Every structure is written in structure tokens, then in C-alpha cells.
Amino acid sequence: MKRIVVLGAGESGSGAAILAKEKGFDVFVSDCGTISDPYRALLDQNGVSWEDGKHSEELILNADEVVKSPGIPLTAPLIQKLQAQGTPIISEIEFASRYTNAKMICITGSNGKTTTTSLIFYILKQAGLNVGLAGNIGNSLALQVAHEDHDYYVIELSSFQLDNMYDFKADVAILLNITPDHLDRYDYKFQNYVDAKFRITRNQTKEDSFIYWAEDPVIDREMKRLQLGATLYPYGFTVPNPLPVSEEELALKGRHNVLNSMAATIAANVVGIKKEVIRESLKTFQGVEHRLQYVATVRGVRWINDSKATNVNSCWYALESMTTPTVLILGGKDKGNDYSEIDELVNEKCHTLVFMGLHNEKLREHFGKLVESQKSKVERPIQIIDTNNLHDAVQAAYHAAKEGDTVLLSPCCASFDLFKSYEDRGEQFMEAVRKL
């Protein structure tokens, strides 16, 4: 009996273990953290052996194949040992795709993935298709394949998931944009990250579709260099507009969301969804939690939760959509960020910056210089307030904001210094705002 070891027992790892067990493999799950109670119960119910708090090498190195959580870097010593002995290491998506004939609509990019994935899923649901939502959102693809296989899957893919995909093929692949992100995981080499993103086109043929933003300079450069097998569908403001509604009628506001809506429209067209269904869906889609999410108005100040902005480019889009004077809360685990990308918008839109994190040194250094350069030019330079937790950050923003202002949480950084996830950060922020 072939032995499958699953490293990491979160949503994707637990799902992969259940599917592997169902397919008759000898399965073992190992997580160096603590496996949460719901996943422990799921593994126990399905008779899957597991351990947590450690990786027992004698139970792992004898695997015929390893399914790795996307959160474990390829540089981890255990992964290096497995690679050195030639053990195949794959992602949960790669594993699950072997056991379904469903059409795969896959979305990647540095920003806009969750919004675009959710919008495409919504359009397909409105059209009455039997469709599942998987990848970074929704339930694990493997668990859905095991328990309730669908005809279509709309899958949000990070670069980490794409790293360990080899034979998987997207019927429809969408690449939204590429800006520097996660460089700490790619030896601080931007091209390594770019190459990971383009893995979404791997194994595609003329029967498959590749939808991409034509005006993204990095994508444009790569498209001139690469010979891709798929049928190409570029979109943007300089190519024919695929939208069946005017920009004003779109439920999602902001220039970046016009682009996301274009990508979703082309995907729906490729799948064969009727134009009237697409039109209605674009007008009625509700958006995504923690992405420019309105929280409350307190004493005339609007509070916006954009906790999903885990990189500088996401924050750029958030600031671009601000129409009133802004207090920006930012900070967290830095991933090799270049904050100069938002200097112009910070100058234009913000009167106060509130840093929230355990390591604000890089923020202080960068934006301190920006404020110094302002002093000779403007009457009131930007105010900087340094905090090391969310409660103090919200209180500082509350006292700095005036009636008619907006307080925007758009951290530019990962959440793992103070929070479990960006969702946890967003939930705690909204709770703190509602208590004001």
C-alpha cells in the first residue's frame, strides 16, 4: 500500500488526508504546530493517524509521496531532506485534481485574487452550475472531491500553492497582476516570484484559456518572452472592453475592481454563461470581507477594514479609492516591502499614519524621511503615531481623526506578528471599532 504523508493539518492538509484515506492509501498527518479541534475530530472520524507539536522523521521520511501545506517553505530542513532522497512533494490541489474530471477555473495574482475568485463563483452559481469554491478560500478542494464532487471549481491559488504543482492543468487560468510580494520566500529575487505565478499556465493547450491583464508591465514583459500553449484573452483599459454593463453599474467600486470585473466577465464568457446572467451578477455581487469593508461611522468618521491588504500594492489600491482625508493604520510582519510605492498617495491622502506592529523600525525609518522632506514644503506635515498593538492603534486613530475623515486599516504587511491570520486581524479591528 502506497504511503502518503501530509505535512500541515489545516484546511488543505486535512482535506488531502481524508481524500488519500478514501482512495486506499496508508496516510499519516504531521503538524509541528497544534492541530485545531475541528481538524482533529475530522481526522479521527476518518481513521487518519496524526501527530502535532513535532515532525517525527522516522514516520515521514518513509513516505512514497508527501502533500505539503503551502505555508511550509521549501527551505525547511525536513523538506530539504525529503528532496535530497527524491521523495515527490506536491500540493493539496495537485493531489485532489487526480481524482476529479471537473473543469478548473484558477485565479492568481498579487492582488485581487479573493475578490475575483468570489465574483466568478457568484456568477457561476447565479447561472445554476454545480460549482465549488476552493484554494485559499472556501473548503479544501480535496475534501470537496472526496465528499461532494462538483462539475466546476473556482480556485484561488497563491504562489506557494503553484510551487508544488506539476501535472495539474487549469482549464481557465487567470493572472491578475504581479507586484513584489512574499520576496522573503523567494530568496528576495523578484523573478523567482514571477516564475511561480506563471506556473498557472503550466500544461495548458489550445483548448484551455489564459486570461491576463495586458497593461501589467511585468506580465507584458513575460508574455513577450514566453511561448504559451493556451488560447490568450488579454483584458485592460487599452483593449476592447468585455464588460456588459457600464463601470457606474458595477457593484464593486474602484479602478482595480473594474479590472477584476473584466477578468471575471471573460472567464464567465469562456465557460458559456449567458450575457444577462453576467450582467445581473456584476450589478448585485456583495464583495469580500476584509477587503475595503465598511465597518461603521463613529462621530462622523468612517472606519474601513482592509486587513486583506498584506502587501504594499494592495494598500496602494485602497488609498487610491479614498475620497476624504485619511488616517492610515499599517504595520505587521514585513515581507521585504518597498513602501516608496505608496509615498505619493500617502502625501496626497493621509494626515496621520498609525503604526501597529511588533517591529515598526522599517516603517519609522521610511516614513520618518517622508515627513522630514515635507516640513519645508507644507504647513502641517503628516503626523506619525507608533503603537505595538491593535487596541492602542485604534485609540490613536480615533483621537487623530476629525469629522468627515476616514480611518483605513490597510496594513501593507502579513498579520503573523500579532494575529492568527488577516481575518483574525480584521475581526479584532472591527470589534475594537464597534466598542468606540
Give names to the regions the model predicted:
Residues 21-22, 57-63, 70-214, 218-230, ...:
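Phosphate-binding loop of NTP-binding sites
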Residues 26-33, 210-214, 329-330, 349-358:
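Short internal beta-strands
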Residues 84, 227-231, 239-243, 368-383:
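Short, basic, low-complexity termini and linkers enriched in Ser/Thr/Gly/Pro
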Residues 1-91, 95, 253, 365:
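N-terminal leader/targeting and accessory segments in enzymes
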Residues 3, 15-23, 250-351:
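Nucleotide phosphate-binding/pyrophosphate-handling subdomain across enzymes
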Residues 20, 66, 107, 136, ...:
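Residue-level signal for inorganic ion chemistry
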Residues 11, 73, 111-115, 258, ...:
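Residue-level detector of alpha-helix initiation sites
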Residues 39-41, 340-404:
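C-terminal helical cap/extension that packs against the catalytic core
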